[in-house]
Curated annotation (Swiss-Prot):
Molecular function GO terms recorded: anthranilate phosphoribosyltransferase activity; magnesium ion binding
First-level EC class: transferase
GO terms classed as biological process: L-tryptophan biosynthetic process
Membrane-spanning intervals of the chain: none
A GO CC annotation given for this chain: cytosol
Binding site for Mg(2+) 1: S96, E229
Protein family (similarity comment): Belongs to the anthranilate phosphoribosyltransferase family.
Binding site for anthranilate 1: G84, N115
Pathway: Amino-acid biosynthesis; L-tryptophan biosynthesis; L-tryptophan from chorismate: step 2/5
Protein name: Anthranilate phosphoribosyltransferase
Subunit structure: Homodimer.
Amino acid sequence: MSETQSWSSVLIALLAREDLSVADASWAMRQVMTGEATDAQIAAFLIALRAKGETVDEIVGFRDAVLDHAVGLPVNSMALDIVGTGGDRFGTVNISTTAAIVAAGAGVPVIKHGNRAASSSSGSSDVLAALGIDLTLPPERVAEVLRATGITFAFASAFHPGFANAAAVRSQLGVPTVFNILGPLCNPARPEASAVGVAPLDRVPLIVGVFQTRGATALVFRGDDGLDELSTTGHSHVWEVSRGLVTEHDIDPRDLGLPTAQIEDLLGKDAAHNAAVVRAVLAGQEGPVRDIVVLNAAAGLVSYELAADPSRVQEPILDRFRSHMAVAAEAIDSGAAVSKLEEWVAATR
């Protein structure tokens, strides 16, 4: 690509199937975030990029630009995000959202970052609204809620106003774009620990690579069934990222004492139904949904512990999961998780 950054040089490079540098990728995304790019330029950029195939350096540049233009969310302590990319097309209940509440009930500060539905029957924002949480809070109130309760929700559209500049184009294109990858990587609080479920297998190296390049701590995972969660229907693959190193693991839920579930056991409906499922699980209802929630809450706790003490990576991952599954289960059975939800609802009112 030429030394002078312009849409012409960016598009010529992409059409020639040349990868962009971090700096050039960041320049292009800044044009989108600031509203300087036209709809035609955005559409050409997104399609040419998708046709070529994104690289880790490009995603790093895009992420840096998005976060540079995000509304800040100051945090005074270590925090965790539990999120899924969506796109698995199963329409499950809100597993990562429920797991986030359980993790907060276990005492870990959680900053959930999300948007409208992608693969669940209702997205994290939809089900949280149905649970009674006010999602229209200004950014400073979002931070206050975290300090008061230990959990909060950063609505992507509120903290990334620049996303709106590409919204119409994305809707008209109707195909997945780089923005589908960026969501889980752009929590405005920049939490130290992440647990990220990824549905498309070809997206895993990109997301893992971004965490690795930036020296972040994360557990990235997908079910062999295609879920963007740690699955209980069969094996899951886990990529553990810490201090620039990646360790791969295979997780069989049976090794953790969990019975094998059927995907039908995990399917959701609309936001009201899914909110009722969340409340039932937090109230102690047993069954397949509780099992998968406990497993995914444990993933968040494992990541948070690893961020605090990177030497934990040397310990067997199944041992770490067993330990944190017990913590997650206790958060439910003691009533701490459902109490955390009620605290959260009250704090947003």
